[in-house]
Structure formats: C-alpha cells, structure tokens
C-alpha cells in the first residue's frame, strides 16, 4: 500500500512502536522511538504515546487535554510503565477524573467506575476491554466516535452498543477458552510453546484467550483462526518472562507470511498447511529456554509484614508508587505463620476464595480470584504462610485493607471432617491425603 501511494504522489508517514523490521518502509517519514537514525531518550512508548508526541510536535506544545486517550492506549498496550509512559498515565488519569470528555465519562459511569478511585486498573480491566471489544469483534469506529462526540443522545447510543459488544466478547472468550483447555488437558506433557488452531475461533479475541492460557498453564501460547476459504491461519501469541516471543517468531520466519509484535505479545499469519511445521520450529527454538519455561514465573517478595503494619495510612503511602504495570509491578508482601478464619467461596460458580487472616484482635481480608477450589484444602484456624498484593478495598463508603492472594502454603498436618450422605468429587481430588471412612 505504501509503494502504491508513493507511486500516486501521496506522501505517507508511518508511526509505530513495534519491533522494527530489518528493512524500514519506503515512506516519506517513519516515526518510531527506536528508529536507528534517531536518539529519542525513551524507547518504550506505546502507539498512543507516539501519536501524542506527533501531536505535540505539530502543535508546538503538549496537548494535555489528550492525555486521557494516551493513558488508555499506554495501559491497554501493556508497555513498560516506567519513564515517560509512567508520566503519561499518571497525568492522563488526572485528566480522566476531570470528566471533560463526555463519551469517556458516560462509559465510565455505565461501567460503574467511581472517578474518586479511578486508577490504572480501571483502564486495564474495565475501560480498555470495552473499547477493544468493538474493534475485536467488528469495527473500532464506534469507540473513536464515542471519544469525540458531544451529542448526549449519540453518546448514550454508543455506550449501550459498546457495553453490548463487551458482553458478547466475554461470551466468545469463555467459549474459546473452554475449548482450548479441553485440548490442553489431553496432553500429559505440554510443549514449551502451545500452538492451537480452529476454524471457528474468532481472530479478534485470540490474544485475550492466549493470555488466560499462559496464566493457567504457564506456557507461551499461540492461537490461530484458520480460514478454510483462503487457507490462511492468523494468530496471536502471548508469552512468559522466559521466552522472547518476537525473537522466537523471527527464528521461524521462513514459515510465516508476516509477523510483528513485542517480547511478550505478537501477531502473525501463515498458510494453514504449515501450522505443524511452524509449531515444530518455534518449539525447537524454545527448547533452549526449556528449564526457565517449565520453572514458571518467579515472584519477588518485597517484604514480610506483621498484620499490625497493614494500616490505611501505610497503604495510602504505598499508592505513591502507582501507576503499576509492566516493569513497575505491584509490591508483593508476605505473611508468615498466621491463623486464618471465615473461609468461603464467593462469586459465580464459587470461582473465588475469601478468608481472613487473624492475629489476636487484628484481621486482614484476603481475596483469591479464580482460586475458589483452594477452600477444599483449608481449615478454620489453619496456620498458613502466604504472599499477595495489598490494596484499599472501598465498599459502601467503607475503606479497609485487603490482600489479593498470589500463593499460599500450609506446612502443618490438616484434618478435614467431610462427613455427608454424599461424597463430593472434590474431596477425593486432594493430593497427599489419607482418607478414613
């Protein structure tokens, strides 16, 4: 397309932030923070960050009113939240709290976001997915139109449409995720890189599903939609710290029609007939990192705390480290040999776990998302050690410290009384257990 435009006398300017190819496009200008001929001091801008800097250059000043859009793009793109990106997000959140962009304000209200506690997680888990949903499933135009509109009636219509598409996106993601999990459950020994494809999988959500599978199975994952008419497979990849997925794709480029992305995420296309060969090549490359991949995620514990130190003033001071994200993760805190109480499962299908840590008269709420099954391994008054992320949980105008559980350990012998007229299957699934009938 660039060559054709140039032939027709059109000057083309290319802006990007993905890894640069060996040969740059023959365009009028290529604007990239890592351009080999440049010396820009911060190489990790998102695509939205590059657009912000172009706007600033054209205007001769920083367009502060556009920092909300740049912040959303920066968080949603999962780039490094250090340096200039950190400034963009921190300032952008302040602009978002002012609610001057009517469409964004309406979307936040519909999604139940309280601007008083708006933060980077509000973007990453609520705003970003909604704006992404329309583009993933159909056309991204309505999201852009919402950000630009001043017509309240049109805004209400667009917000309703985006909310609807987000629900649809969630349903599609859940369906593909379940299908992929079933396929992986059949493999006793997972490969270093999981490669799966299906003609019925919606291409627009494959990256989301791949991320879920990486979190669940601990393997870099590449998922493909196979178009039977064209014979082309288009895919999305998500990785772990152990494997640079862009480098892995570059090593297998002979099998690919095109590819692009970053160390942790990428997209690609290739003839569907070459999927098996591609899987073999990328796994051959990943074999040199096998030990690191199998070992899994390493978690750095920032500090071991007594419950007495977990106070609202401490947590408010901790929030000065925000915004959290890639390369600026939330601090991880550990608690050792603490009794627990009030164990229960919560949420749809009892997917989540909730309990309290207790130290004399002190209590700390603990929430474990997607960890509901762990309740089968816990007893009231068990003494445990655990790690997680601390935050302030605001509910009905009440603020309390809360720990989001990452991992838990119980060294002691446990006794479970599961007497019932029916034996639950989950009871028999407990490892290293002795059963008395």
Task: Go through each PLM region and give its residues.
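Short gly/pro/ser/thr-enriched loop/turn and capping motifs at secondary-structure boundaries
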Residues: 18-23, 37-39, 228-232, 243
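Mid-to-C-terminal polyanion-binding domains and interfaces
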Residues: 154-158, 164-196, 229, 250-437
């Amino acid at each position: 397309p660039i060559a054709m435009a140039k032939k027709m006398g059109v000057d083309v300017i290319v802006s990007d932030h993905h890894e640069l190819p060996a040969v740059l496009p023959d365009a009028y200008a290529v604007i990239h923070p890592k351009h080999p001929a440049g010396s820009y001091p911060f190489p990790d801008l998102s695509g939205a960050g590059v657009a912000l800097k172009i706007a600033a250059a054209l205007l001769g000043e920083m367009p502060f009113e556009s920092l909300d859009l740049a912040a959303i793009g920066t968080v949603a793109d999962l780039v490094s939240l250090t340096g200039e990106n950190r400034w963009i997000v921190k300032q952008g959140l302040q602009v978002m709290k002012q609610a001057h962009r009517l469409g964004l304000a309406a979307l936040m209200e519909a999604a139940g976001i309280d601007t008083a506690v708006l933060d980077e997680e509000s973007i990453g888990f609520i705003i970003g997915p909604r704006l992404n949903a329309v583009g993933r499933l159909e056309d991204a135009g309505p999201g852009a139109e919402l950000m630009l509109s001043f017509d309240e009636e049109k805004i209400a219509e667009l917000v309703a449409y985006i909310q609807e598409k987000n629900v649809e996106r969630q349903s599609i993601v859940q369906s593909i995720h379940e299908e992929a999990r079933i396929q992986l459950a059949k493999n006793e020994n997972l490969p270093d890189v999981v490669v799966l494809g299906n003609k019925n999988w919606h291409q627009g959500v494959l990256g989301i599903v791949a991320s879920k599978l990486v979190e669940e199975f601990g393997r870099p994952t590449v998922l493909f939609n196979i178009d039977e008419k064209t014979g082309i497979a288009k895919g999305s990849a998500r990785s772990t710290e152990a494997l640079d997925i862009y480098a892995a794709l570059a090593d297998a480029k002979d099998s690919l029609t095109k590819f692009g992305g970053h160390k942790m995420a990428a997209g690609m296309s290739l003839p569907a007939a070459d999927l098996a060969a591609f899987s073999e090549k990328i796994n051959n490359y990943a074999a040199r990192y096998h030990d690191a991949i199998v070992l899994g995620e390493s978690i750095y514990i920032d500090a071991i705390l007594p419950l007495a130190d977990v106070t609202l003033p401490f947590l408010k001071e901790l929030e000065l480290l925000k915004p959290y994200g890639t390369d600026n993760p939330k601090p991880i805190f550990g608690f050792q040999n603490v009794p627990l109480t009030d164990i229960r499962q919560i949420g749809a299908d009892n997917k989540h776990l909730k309990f309290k840590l207790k130290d004399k008269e002190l209590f700390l709420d603990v929430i474990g998302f997607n960890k509901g099954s762990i309740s089968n391994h816990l007893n009231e008054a068990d003494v445990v050690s655990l790690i997680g992320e601390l935050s302030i949980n605001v509910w009905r105008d009440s603020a309390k410290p809360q720990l989001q559980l990452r991992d838990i350990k119980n060294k002691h012998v446990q006794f479970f009384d599961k007497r019932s007229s029916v034996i639950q299957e989950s009871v028999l699934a407990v490892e290293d257990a002795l059963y008395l009938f």
